[in-house]
Amino acid sequence: MSSRIARALALVVTLLHLTRLALSTCPAACHCPLEAPKCAPGVGLVRDGCGCCKVCAKQLNEDCSKTQPCDHTKGLECNFGASSTALKGICRAQSEGRPCEYNSRIYQNGESFQPNCKHQCTCIDGAVGCIPLCPQELSLPNLGCPNPRLVKVTGQCCEEWVCDEDSIKDPMEDQDGLLGKELGFDASEVELTRNNELIAVGKGSSLKRLPVFGMEPRILYNPLQGQKCIVQTTSWSQCSKTCGTGISTRVTNDNPECRLVKETRICEVRPCGQPVYSSLKKGKKCSKTKKSPEPVRFTYAGCLSVKKYRPKYCGSCVDGRCCTPQLTRTVKMRFRCEDGETFSKNVMMIQSCKCNYNCPHANEAAFPFYRLFNDIHKFRD
């Protein structure tokens, strides 16, 4: 009797073990939902261990498995402990990652935290990366919104765009009117410029343009809607960093809806720690443009560019002048992550630089800070 019970228990244990093994193995064919899952703020999408479906990456100290991998972009890995047959583990930071100090607190590598209600941050190997939790504050207001402004909403953290009516006189109207007469602008044109509106091209014309553009823009015609659109694009802004990876932005309406949208690109004026005087020729005070001595891969969010490039960087001067990009182009660059996931980002490639004494952003603190929605940007406190 006891031998039968022992055999039955052994059979049950064997079946349970086989079931666990079956659940841990990858399917012969991938069957994924049509829509990607929606993850919490600061949580990225990664492919499961079988390379099939996109899932929300597990964060620090969360349970993980082959089908529920950890967020490798934050330096996390699934720790199964000493057991070689364990099916579930816990997301731990890789041992080589450095902790972060932010606002007088220490955070471990891979640890996520929320310093305020508007940002979700993560410690990534000694640097803190944050994403905004209020994306509407980073976007442009809708066209036709007079005097748009961000206002606080009772009981909410994020501010919202509010459109004012023309019942209250703008104190800038008199100044705009004076400037308009002196510079030859129409008063309505100045008002539309401030409101981010498109204005008519010529009298009685149904075409529109932005006053900030001096050259004639091209015309985009939508036959389905029967509308004409003047395609206009502003120049790229300065890079948000004097050295290292930064962000550059511009505004354009080059899309089927003819809507003003903000575009971003990754930029790097020069690597941090670049020697200032070593490359100067005898008698020269400036080194305008420098080319990378060897092909390099760009890095972004822990992923590497598929191709290697030899980018140009701006140099420096010894007489107080600063060197900034003069001519640039934008390259659509493909990146590949450790799990095989690929994505594309716009990247600035410098063609030439210029050096002058006009250095309004020589102080790093004076730089405008641009954020890419749903991306992580590194900065040090």
From Swiss-Prot:
Disulfide bonds: 26-50, 30-52, 32-53, 39-56, 64-78, 70-91, 286-323, 303-337, 314-353, 317-355, 322-359
Gene3D superfamilies, per the entry: Complement Module, domain 1 (2.10.70.10), Thrombospondin type-1 (TSP1) repeat (2.20.100.10)
Protein's name in the database: CCN family member 1
Gene Ontology process terms (BP): apoptotic process involved in heart morphogenesis; atrial septum morphogenesis; atrioventricular valve morphogenesis; cell adhesion; chemotaxis; chondroblast differentiation; chorio-allantoic fusion; extracellular matrix organization
Annotated CTCK domain residues: 286-360
SUPFAM superfamilies: FnI-like domain, Growth factor receptor domain, TSP-1 type 1 repeat
Domain of life of the organism encoding this protein: Eukaryota
Biological source species: Homo sapiens (Human)
Subunit record text: Interaction with integrins is heparin- and cell-type-dependent and promotes cell adhesion. In skin fibroblasts it binds ITGA6/ITGB1, in endothelial cells, binds ITGAV/ITGB3 and in platelets, ITGA2B/ITGB3. Binds, in vitro, ITGAV/ITGB5.
Modified residues (Phosphoserine): 188
Family matches, as PANTHER family: CCN FAMILY MEMBER 1 (PTHR11348:SF18), CONNECTIVE TISSUE GROWTH FACTOR-RELATED (PTHR11348)
